[in-house]
């Protein structure tokens, strides 16, 4: 009986660890580590030219919830996920 319970718990733990529903861990990325991580994540992502956007998109009301914060504010001063870092690619 004990062996069955241990095996069941082991299967549950492994399933949770491997599931896509697991939360991504937020970490801090600063300095060289931030630059290297961005370079690795953004490799091959096509960069967009700012010229394709009308100037009014750069006004404060169109900057969204990020405002003037940058990648250092979001990922060095506070922990962030890889999804946040990926949002700075391109």
UniProtKB/Swiss-Prot annotation:
Range of residues in the leader sequence: 1-20
Primary residence: secreted
GO terms for MF: growth factor activity; hormone activity; insulin-like growth factor receptor binding; protein serine/threonine kinase activator activity
Matching CDD domains: IlGF_insulin_bombyxin_like
Pfam short name (any one): Insulin
Propiece residues: 49-67
Disulphide bridges, residue numbers: 30-76, 42-89, 75-80
Any one GO biological process: positive regulation of MAPK cascade
Annotated compartments: Secreted
Annotated keywords: Cleavage on pair of basic residues, Disulfide bond, Hormone, Secreted, Signal
A cellular component annotation (GO) from this entry: extracellular space
Domain of life: Eukaryota
Subunit structure: Heterodimer of a B chain and an A chain linked by two disulfide bonds.
Family of the protein in this entry: Belongs to the insulin family.
General function of this protein: Brain peptide responsible for activation of prothoracic glands to produce ecdysone in insects.
Miscellaneous information on this protein: Silk worm has two kinds of PTTH: 4K-PTTH and 22K-PTTH; there are many forms of 4K-PTTH.
Protein name: Bombyxin B-4
Organism the protein comes from: Bombyx mori
């Amino acid at each position: 009986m004990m062996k069955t319970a241990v095996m069941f718990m082991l299967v549950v733990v492994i399933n949770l660890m491997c599931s896509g529903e697991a939360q991504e861990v937020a970490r801090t990325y600063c300095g060289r580590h931030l630059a290297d991580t961005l370079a690795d994540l953004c490799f091959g992502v096509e960069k967009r030219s700012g010229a394709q956007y009308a100037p009014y998109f750069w006004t404060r009301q169109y900057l969204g919830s990020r405002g003037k914060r940058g990648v250092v504010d979001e990922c060095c001063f506070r922990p962030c996920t890889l999804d946040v870092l990926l949002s700075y690619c391109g």
